[in-house]
Amino acid sequence: MQYSEIMVRHGELSTKGKNRMRFINKLKRNIQEVLSPFPNIKVRSDRDRTHVFLNGTPYEPVAEALKNVFGIQAFNPVYKLEKNVDLLIASVQEIMKDLYVDGMTFKISSKRSDHHFELDSRDLNLVLGNAVFDVLPNIKAQMKKPDVNLKVEIRDEAAYISHEEIKGAGGLPVGTSGKGMLMLSGGIDSPVAGYLALKRGVEIEAVHFASPPYTSPGALKKAQDLTRKLTKFGGNIQFIEVPFTEIQEEIKDKAPEAYLMTLTRRFMMRITDAIRASRSGLVIVNGESLGQVASQTLESMQAINAVTATPVIRPVVTMDKLEIIELAEKIDTFSISIQPFEDCCTIFAPDRPKTNPKLKNVEEYEKRFDIDGLVQRAVKGIKITEIKPEAEADDVDLMLDALL
């Protein structure tokens, strides 16, 4: 027998009261986007659960995709049948014969919401249990923690059988907590920060600074590939490429070397904040980890943060590098992040950056720049691409990647 659909149980949505259906509908849209590589799938939601109709699509890759979607507590692949006792008996026997191994224990758990059905839950348990013994006389029934708990649900529209429950990713549906701008460099930390923001329901748009010809097309593709990895947790993500060459050249020409990084990061923060304001964002998200590099000391963070009143979320700020790497490996971004393409944070990096920059000094150096003009030109020149989930790359894609 082939699974006909997957029943999805919602996560923290049960706590959301009057907003429950808004959360459920957002989760439905996220599931549809994540499963977009499977064109035959249909998704429908009600207050209790979301139904993913397979329509002939193989179950296994769909289940792998659903495991990552935030807002899902658990899901069950199910067989959908007509409400006919003889059909239920034959189906239960076939399922159990396929599952059976020596020494297996089982339990039938029936639930009837259609009270017009000819058998109540207790009688249905008895009839189906006896049917299993008829074809598997050596199997044993066990009420507590059986090897197989075969769940049979009689609803108004159909009968459903399931025996497997898969744990979901938990968290909140992406987009239910508002929108944030993720400052995505291409390193290890910022994709992990994006993942953690997504988990708490923040819809992210990835802001990436490019400085051609100093940064290569490979660096841009790397950032887009990282963004695509993040789409599996909640659907499509807008990728915003910011032209940053003019600003970096001005900073290099006009500022003391020790302050290059601080000034660069302040410009990045200004530009990200301007993009946020124009796109209805509420926060900025970045991958800063306290003390990891010179621009991530408390003094540096204070000097950089001073250009905006917008909240800046730093999900990995207290994590050790090894903890961040472990998460990067879990979400499958690590191997992309370590590809040897320089980003705009490294191309002009000074040998001895200032670890405790003084705000008054930074502001004095910035008088040498047309800050408003530089920021406006950068924002005006942004390119926006919608990054969507994709099926696994084929051999041709892998060969092309290897050539870059």
Swiss-Prot record:
Q: What is its EC number?
A: 2.8.1.4
One annotated Gene Ontology cellular component of this protein = cytosol
Keyword set includes Hydrolase: no
Q: Where found?
A: Cytoplasm
Pathway assignment reads: Cofactor biosynthesis; thiamine diphosphate biosynthesis
Record-annotated THUMP domain positions: 60-165
Q: What class of enzyme is it?
A: transferase
One GO molecular function term of this record is: tRNA-uracil-4 sulfurtransferase activity
Q: Which residues form a coiled coil?
A: none
Function of the protein: Catalyzes the ATP-dependent transfer of a sulfur to tRNA to produce 4-thiouridine in position 8 of tRNAs, which functions as a near-UV photosensor. Also catalyzes the transfer of sulfur to the sulfur carrier protein ThiS, forming ThiS-thiocarboxylate. This is a step in the synthesis of thiazole, in the thiamine biosynthesis pathway. The sulfur is donated as persulfide by IscS.
Q: Which HAMAP family match?
A: ThiI
Tell me its family. Answer: Belongs to the ThiI family.
Q: What is this protein called?
A: Probable tRNA sulfurtransferase
Record the organism: Streptococcus uberis (strain ATCC BAA-854 / 0140J)
